[in-house]
Amino acid sequence: MPLPNHVTSHLRSLQLAPAAVHYNLKRPRLYEEALDRNEGQLAAGGPLVTRTAPYTGRSPKDRFIVRDASVADQINWGEVNQPTDRATFDHLHERMAEHAEGRDLFVQDLHAGWDESYRLPVRIITEKAWHSLFARNMFVRPDGPVPDSFEPGFTVVDLCEFEADPERDGTHSEAAVFVDIAQNLILIGGTHYGGEIKKSIFSVLNYMLPEEGVLPMHCSANEGEDGDTAVFFGLSGTGKTTLSADASRTLIGDDEHGWSDRGVYNFEGGCYAKMIDITPESEPEIHGTTEEFGTILENVIVDPDTREPDFSDDTITQNTRGSYPLHYIPNTSSDGRGGHPDHVLFLTYDAFGVLPPVSELSPAQAMYHFLSGYTAKVAGTEAGVNEPKATFSTCFGEPFMVRDPSVYAELLGQKIRRHDTDCWLVNTGMTGGPYGVGHRIELDHTRAMVDAILDGTLGTVARTRDPVFGLSIPDRVPGVPDSVLTPRQTWGDPQAYDQHARELVDAFADNFETYVEQVGTEVRAAGPSLETIRG
């Protein structure tokens, strides 16, 4: 099949002169190319197993955005969104073009977003066949041949074998993820990690969509039989994937969505799931994808003889990943869309053990907790001492939020008020004490709480206001002991509870100082208060 003229001319404009171009190859051909080029190996059942070392995760310190007049005052510059200048970008572009000369390239024309009113046409250019398959898994694939009228709104050039030189290229390492919004171009080099491709486009959508009144969200989403839609925000380890995977509800998507005036829609055509320690019992749907032709298993160890994957083996990394089309998961949406959310759930893992397991939020509280993006983790276990550490990631996705967080929070506030959306804080972390003393809230109890939210039960029960965090706690949840609902009552030492609550309140207050001048009085007053803590 001859290469379309619009692709040839675009490659020329990008200064790319490859030996050959493989355009929009489908899975079987990409498998052949990847295996012929020794880019991976087959696992039992059909997945393609690849390696990304030394980078087995994103490299946020190597991500830069070109700072020019058109975007300078619209981007939240800092450690997350590091600026670079156009001369540096253009120099890197030239060096990468030299690297690509005479090599084979793979091109995929796809879309980011299922809603045709807001979708972004993307062109993904890679030097690895498996990266082309990754892109085809993760983005929205065309129903038929790509029309000659296809014009990419953004282009990713991923030349993973190119290694940047920090002295010459203005980088911090051999890896480079450079974004030029004005030229609609992303350059990725020096890293084989597939997630850089998908997250670079997600960052672009986080810049572009607010201007169209669309709230980009780092969340999962599902839909009930009656068309009711729920959105789940949550950082790693909070249970976002587990709790949104419900056999009685249709999965819209597991990671990236937009909320427009038409409702919720998935940005992606696939999933990029963590694979460490999964079993048919713990994650049956996700485990099933590991036996499918077309799935990519990143950094998963396989038996050299049987080629059976060992998902418990973290020899390379704990961040083993699987990339697969969304339809490999049973009961997924056929059009990637849902209505306006009836419920928004913020999931947090509170290692302090002081947040209630479920509580309803006012719109102002929802904006406060959205801006905070709180979860917690255990800092260490030295000498048997486990100290919880508060972690905040604004909008539950700080690494990908290009604009000021208040832009996204204001959009969220507008939408939940306009559509009368109920918002909830669900703590999937500790109860009865902090990490090392208490225990994790039982998954069955958390599922019962989520079920009661989604079926409307919690909207009708009496509430009690938590005096510390100001949250509205349901007095009853079917299937959950009443004693579990009020965290102070689960502690053997109430004074110890108060002390840990003080620590978390202080952490919230310190973190929110960043946003105090950017939000109204109502949102500022929606956080926890030390004055109400007993003792």
UniProtKB/Swiss-Prot annotation:
Q: Which reaction does it catalyse?
A: oxaloacetate + ATP = phosphoenolpyruvate + ADP + CO2
Q: Name one GO cellular component term.
A: cytosol
| Annotated GO biological process | gluconeogenesis
UniProt cross-references to SUPFAM superfamilies, sorted A to Z: PEP carboxykinase N-terminal domain (SSF68923), PEP carboxykinase-like (SSF53795)
Binding-site residues for substrate, renumbered to this chain: 58, 193, 199, 321
Similarity annotation? Belongs to the phosphoenolpyruvate carboxykinase (ATP) family.
Protein name per its UniProtKB record: Phosphoenolpyruvate carboxykinase (ATP) 1
Protein's organism:
Salinibacter ruber (strain DSM 13855 / M31)
Gene that produces this protein: pckA1
